Structure formats: C-alpha cells, structure tokens
Amino acid sequence: LTHNETSTGVMMSLVRPAGSGDALVVVDATSAAGGLLWDPAEVDVYYFAPQKSFASDGGIWFAACSSRAIERIEKISASKRWTPASLDLKIALDNSKANQTYNTPALATLIMLESQVGWMNEIGGLSACNARSQQSSSILYSWAQARSWATPFVADAEKRSQVVGTIDIAASADGGVDANDICAALRANGVVDTDSYRKLGRNQLRVGMFPAVDPEDVQALTACIDVVVEALRG
C-alpha cells in the first residue's frame, strides 16, 4: 500500500484488508511518515526515507516492523534462499538490533533528522504534526475552492493529501493562466518548489505541507498566487 502518493497528492487510510490471512501488509510511507496518523495494528511494515516530513535527506531507509514481519524475515533467511545484500532485510534487522547500519550513512542526514525529530516531539509528537499538516491543507484546499480558476485535483475530499496538495489551474481560455507562468513568477520572487509532477500532464501547482512548513506560510503562499494570477490575467 502507499499511504500518501507524492506526485498526485492522494492519501489513503491504512486498514488491513479483509481476508488477508497471514499475508503481510507492507506500506510505502516516504511522504506520509511523520505527517499522517496511522495505526500500527493495521500494518506489518511501515517504511520510509526521511526527506519529506522529517526534513532531512534521502539515502537512508527506515522501517517499523511488526513481530509477524520480523518472523517472516527470519524465516526467509533461515531458508538459505539467495538474496542480494541490497535486498536482504535480515542484514538490516541484525544491524538495527546492534544500533548499526550496514552501510555508512551521511552524517548530515542524521544530524538534520535528529534535529527534526526533536522538534516534532517538542510540539507534541505525531498527533501535533498531523494537526499542523491538516491545518495547512485546509487552508490550501479552502482557498482553491473559493477561486473560479483553481480546483483541488483530488475530487474526493477524504483522499486529498494533508502533506502534498495538488491544485488544478484553469486554462487561459477558461479564465485561468498557465501554471508554469505562475511558478516562474513565484520563483523569480524567491518562492520555489510549486511545480507539478510533469508526467501527470496537467496545468497544476503542487504544494508541500509537511509539518516543518508553517501554516501561516501556506496562507501567505495563497495570497502570493492570487497576486500573480491577477497580474498574469491582466
């Protein structure tokens, strides 16, 4: 499962599928971990890298594993089935138990991660981080719905991501503007990283709303976009 899809701005509730039996529920949580709530009882492996909500760099991998997942890792290892080291979870598990990593991670990544985790715990942990992202996303989506030329890309409000918002912009012929022109104007004035995922092929803005992003900054961004669109529309 994918807890949050970064390119499209879609999130899902994590629920163990009915009738899954002894199958493991494995979740890609790279853009969700630290910003969205989840119930450990519903999953077996929740894995991520820290470059999103944890405000660090990629290049290191973390996984929260249930006892069932650990048992499966041990069982596969005991079977002597060949597995390349890069995919051998037993190596990762053994190193984790020893408070080590198989490969040497970049020190800067760990320093930034430690700083961010400390701040996240100071403000109240995961529940507070979730609330912060929820506030930011509410600001963004409410703003878009109040504009004739902007629409949340994800139609189902329950599935709109709290941490990555995608906003469709109407075409010029429909009273809108080119989203690339909006991004260019923002970038020229020091507001960066509002570009959409190009392969999606939409006239769209994409906004990060991870816990480290102040909701007031999201509010300020919407005001900036209003000014830019007004200027572009002439």
What do these predicted ranges mean?
Residues 149-154, 191-196:
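A short linear hydrophobic-aromatic micro-motif
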Residues 151-185:
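Conserved PLP-binding catalytic core of the aspartate aminotransferase-like
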Residues 157-164, 198-206:
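Small/polar glycine-rich anion-binding or flexible loop at a beta-alpha turn
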Residues 178-189, 221-226:
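Short amphipathic alpha-helices in soluble, non-transmembrane regions
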Residues 199-234:
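PLP-dependent enzyme catalytic core of the Aspartate aminotransferase-like
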